[in-house]
Amino acid sequence: RVLFRSFVCNLKGGGSKTVSTASLSHAFRAHPQLLFEDLRILAIDFDPQASLTMFLSHENSVGLVENTAAQAMLQNVSREELLSDFIVPSIIPGVDVIPASIDDAFLAEGWKGLCEEHLPGKNIHAVLKENIIDKLQHDYDFIFLDSGPHLDAFLKNCIGAADLMLTPLPPATVDFHSSLKFVASLPALIDSIEMDGHTCNLIGNVGFMSKILNKSDHKICHSQAKEVFGADMLDMVLPRLDGFERCGETFDTVISANPATYDGSTEALKSAKSAAEDFAKAVFDRIEFIRTNGGM
């Protein structure tokens, strides 16, 4: 199986990027129908808030964390160092994470100068792909990327490294509008990366509804999103359920949460887990379809 890289991206804060990425990472490994695939999953966190790290390996999101994904890029460490010093296991075996830290924000801010100093001759948008992902292509089957809601060097590196983008579309009016504005600006953003000398290998951008309820205005948003994305819109959604919010409070995903210690209705947890698994299977099937057909 050839490594496939997905980037869940939206410039709207609170748009379910991290919840989606964490749920996909765990569900790709633990979904009953995907167990036999024995998929090796790596999540890479570039959000200085380290929310993805909290979900997947919360002990690595506390205090001073020096071995972050941003540092791995900048230090251009070897594959062996990546595996031994930077990659940490999540609570589900077979799913690993490279953490983020609040200090990474300063690296993103001065990225161009840092690259000129530490990585002379390297394209500033190709660092993630060349210094991390290319070294791990035989160690993982899927890599999920998560960045903060900022148009910074890390987001551009994620776009420059991804095979596929996934855009969560929350239906709240302001969130939905800003999400569609981001989608409209993507071609120009990709052009700017390529004009700087790095070729993007994006096959496409798949949209999906997040935080959705069974309400008429949410259904209208879903219809409008289908008009924008066409066949690139997933029918499967990531609904707004109590289980997702409660699990976030205990640094779990709905996949990894223990029903015995879950602070809430076990039925609610079961519903959220089922929704996350259904969503992950739909994403997996779409990726396999794209691979088989050589594009969208």
What are these regions (language model features)?
Residues 1-296:
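P-loop NTP-binding core
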